[in-house]
Amino acid sequence: MINIRKTHPLMKIINNSFIDLPAPSNISSWWNFGSLLGICLILQILTGLFLAMHYTSDTMTAFSSVTHICRDVNYGWLIRYLHANGASMFFICLFLHVGRGMYYGSYMFMETWNIGVLLLFAVMATAFMGYVLPWGQMSFWGATVITNLLSAIPYIGTDLVEWIWGGFSVDKATLTRFFAFHFILPFIVAALAGVHLLFLHETGSNNPSGLTSDSDKIPFHPYYTIKDILGALVLILALSTLVLFSPDLLGDPDNYIPANPLNTPPHIKPEWYFLFAYAILRSIPNKLGGVLALVLSILVLALMPVLHTSKQRSMMFRPISQCLFWLLVADLLTLTWIGGQPVEHPFIIIGQLASILYFSLILVLMPLASLLENNLLKW
């Protein structure tokens, strides 16, 4: 009998992606984050869909509609907090996924990596626009500050900002279009994730050693399906704990104050997952320079394959590069902390030093360390 799993046009795609896929036998739990990101995306789309059924994208009623969801809709509070904290879990998984790619040299799969960078930008744009929707103080002022950065673009800047706003300030038109974009972008992200997987399956997965694993492959199912289910359970446990015990832990209390264009909050700051980029933006006194640094802080990831000077793919056997990688992690944590602090001494200088170190590590120190390691191994 012919197996329908292997012959049916649709089943065949699923089979070749999740069942009979040959996978390296030694991939660690760091390879779980791809599937976890898929789960996060599905969760966000589902909770977002149910929120959109009750939300109104009008400046007069947006804040009230979110309150209505939390108070009057059956389990509305749960859906709302799953969506808000689901975004945080999404970014935790994203950062770990990208970090894994940097550590083990997964960026050598050029197409997969570049689509991944594009995905990162798309998810960041989605999260930013989603943060504007509750129309609290931080929503309004965050939208004002971040969209205003585009005015730094020479010649067309001011026109561009007013075009995005749909007027001369962040108002009803802005909120409505942000809701429309926030609704459509996750589906674009899902499509890009499909392309991301398509390119990954052209080459097969990397593995911790960075060596080719063609001689030692195992089927994805049952080995990695069960491993992914364990990862999913840990993710769901962490998210449930966050949502049910401290749902506002990662949020800003200012967002419980309805948006008021006449009253600026003392400290305007984005959600925690943007703080590292926000710190880099603020560390440069020039507006255009800051915007360029902000974009480059993510875009620099696209240069990783070009900056790879080592003769080994993975950092598994490269202790100097390992030290610099963990220094980069510590630096990003420092930038995240600085991004949430007021613009005053000593935070300004710490932020500037951390920003310089961030770019120096990726663009200069890590490639040099790789060359040094090549020489030490007499390669």
Curated annotation (Swiss-Prot):
GO terms for cellular component: mitochondrial inner membrane; respiratory chain complex III. A ubiquinone binds at H201. This is Cytochrome b. It is found in: Mitochondrion inner membrane. InterPro entries: Cyt_b/b6_C, Cyt_b/b6_C_sf, Cyt_b/b6_N, Cytb/b6-like_sf, Cytochrome_b, Cytochrome_b_C_euk/bac, Cytochrome_b_N_euk/bac, Di-haem_cyt_TM. Belongs to the cytochrome b family. The cytochrome bc1 complex contains 11 subunits: 3 respiratory subunits (MT-CYB, CYC1 and UQCRFS1), 2 core proteins (UQCRC1 and UQCRC2) and 6 low-molecular weight proteins (UQCRH/QCR6, UQCRB/QCR7, UQCRQ/QCR8, UQCR10/QCR9, UQCR11/QCR10 and a cleavage product of UQCRFS1). This cytochrome bc1 complex then forms a dimer. The keyword Zinc does not apply. Component of the ubiquinol-cytochrome c reductase complex (complex III or cytochrome b-c1 complex) that is part of the mitochondrial respiratory chain. The b-c1 complex mediates electron transfer from ubiquinol to cytochrome c. Contributes to the generation of a proton gradient across the mitochondrial membrane that is then used for ATP synthesis. Heme b b562 binds at H83, H182. Heme b b566 binds at H97, H196.
